[in-house]
């Protein structure tokens, strides 16, 4: 082992657990095995190929040299930031305090650096996207959770209230990462009643100290309920405009534009014009990655000025939302046929199957060529990469794995 590596950096796994599972699945498939790979976190078509939105790539190919090569401003092109915020809240005239980031992960990382002190903890849902914990650890912070509602059940307001008040009491501030609507990894969104309860709790706790709500938006364009998504965004806008809770958003082009490799997004607080907040975000950018790629920012600006391209993109989003919905319906039907409960997907790329001993169940599934991602609460299943025709195999293999004790 390299002696120069400090002791606290010597015990990490060689690869991210999700990427390691995906690599194992691909290796076994390449070796001739029949593999069902539900670990994938990108949208695949029925042939198992990466979906790349043609409307977006048409704009990409049209970019000029000067839209690609120069440095972008440290905090990002202001017009890009405004255009990205207005994709989510069209009536807003400004991005507020905002900066460009390398994808949504960059936005999450910057929020930790600016809204918590080292040693403090952020709050998020259980279950959550695994790299949340990695981001917290890398910034010297902890992570605590409150429960995401079960299918058909309301938000556990008492548990959320206790978590919020505990953090406020112990550290004097709260940062909540909320992946809603289209929650990763459950594929379900908060109901209007759930949101009302949670926002009420946030308002109450904000009387005791600073509260920041960061909405982690990644999958909003892939939903069977676009009207519900719009209603949720309006509710969060109302909370942000009140000003008692600092409401921001982690925005990304990765899924929405299928520009995973462009690594472009933003951290935006549309209802804040605080110059100190803007200066802090800009400082973090300069001290972390300096600035972000210009090309994807230029692409979004072209999109914002091209109504026909927007129509083509919306049509592609509708199509792939229908594909995901059909996969989710097929999976629910297959689970029911095997005597298990349906999962009631509403949006996003994933669903979560609640199981006892997730690691053990995941291992038994792998032995039969079915790959999932184990979580403390169960198994994350990527319907983004699983064809509807594969769902009966998945359900039957899962039933078999659960029958082993």
What residues fall within each predicted segment?
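N-terminal small-domain helix-loop-helix segment of the aminotransferase-like
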Residues: 2, 11-103, 405
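Short beta-strand
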Residues: 35-37, 73, 250, 341-346, ...
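Short catalytic/ligand-binding loop motif for oxyanion handling, primarily in non-cytosolic enzymes
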Residues: 44-49, 184-187, 221-224, 257-260, ...
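Conserved core of the PLP fold type I
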Residues: 64-209, 213, 220-241
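PLP-dependent enzyme catalytic core of the Aspartate aminotransferase-like
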Residues: 86, 92, 164-170, 243, ...
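Conserved core segment of the aminotransferase class I/II
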Residues: 237-321
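Short hydrophobic/aromatic beta-strand micro-patches
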Residues: 268, 352-354, 382-384
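Conserved glycine-rich beta-strand-loop-beta hairpin in the small C-terminal domain of fold type I
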Residues: 314-335, 339-354, 374-377
């Amino acid at each position: 082992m390299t002696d120069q590596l400090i002791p606290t950096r010597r015990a990490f796994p060689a690869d991210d657990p999700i990427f390691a599972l995906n690599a194992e699945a691909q290796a076994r498939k390449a070796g001739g095995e029949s593999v069902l790979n539900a670990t994938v976190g990108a949208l695949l078509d029925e042939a198992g190929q990466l979906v790349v939105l043609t409307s977006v790539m048409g704009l990409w190919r049209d970019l000029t040299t000067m839209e690609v090569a120069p440095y972008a401003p440290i905090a990002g092109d202001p017009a890009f930031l405004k255009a990205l915020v207005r994709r989510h809240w069209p009536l807003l005239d400004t991005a507020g305090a905002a900066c460009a980031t390398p994808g949504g992960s960059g936005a999450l990382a910057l929020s930790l650096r600016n809204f918590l002190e080292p040693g403090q903890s952020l709050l998020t849902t259980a279950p959550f996207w695994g790299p949340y914990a990695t981001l917290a650890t890398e910034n010297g912070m902890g992570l605590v959770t409150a429960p995401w509602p079960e299918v058909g059940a309301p938000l556990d307001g008492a548990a959320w209230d206790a978590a919020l008040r505990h953090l406020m009491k112990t550290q004097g501030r709260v940062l909540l990462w909320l992946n809603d609507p289209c929650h990763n990894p459950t594929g379900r969104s908060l109901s209007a009643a759930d949101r009302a309860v949670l926002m009420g709790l946030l308002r109450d706790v904000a009387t005791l100290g600073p509260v920041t709500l960061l909405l982690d938006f990644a999958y909003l364009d892939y939903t069977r309920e676009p009207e519900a998504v719009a209603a949720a965004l309006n509710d969060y806008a109302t909370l942000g405009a009140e000003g008692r809770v600092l409401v921001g958003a982690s925005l990304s082009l990765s899924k929405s534009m299928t520009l995973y490799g462009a690594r472009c997004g933003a951290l935006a607080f549309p209802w804040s014009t605080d110059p100190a907040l803007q200066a802090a975000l800009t400082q973090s950018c300069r001290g972390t990655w300096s600035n972000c790629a210009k090309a994807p920012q230029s692409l979004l600006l072209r999109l914002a000025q091209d109504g026909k391209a927007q129509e083509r993109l919306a049509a592609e989003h509708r199509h792939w939302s229908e594909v995901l919905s059909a996969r989710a319906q097929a999976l629910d039907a297959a689970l029911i046929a095997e005597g298990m409960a349906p999962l009631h997907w509403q949006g996003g790329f994933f669903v979560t199957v609640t199981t006892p001993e997730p690691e053990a169940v995941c291992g038994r599934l792998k032995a039969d060529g079915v790959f999932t991602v184990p979580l403390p609460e169960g198994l994350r299943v990527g319907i983004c990469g699983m064809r509807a025709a594969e769902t009966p195999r998945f359900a039957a293999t899962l039933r078999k794995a659960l029958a082993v004790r």
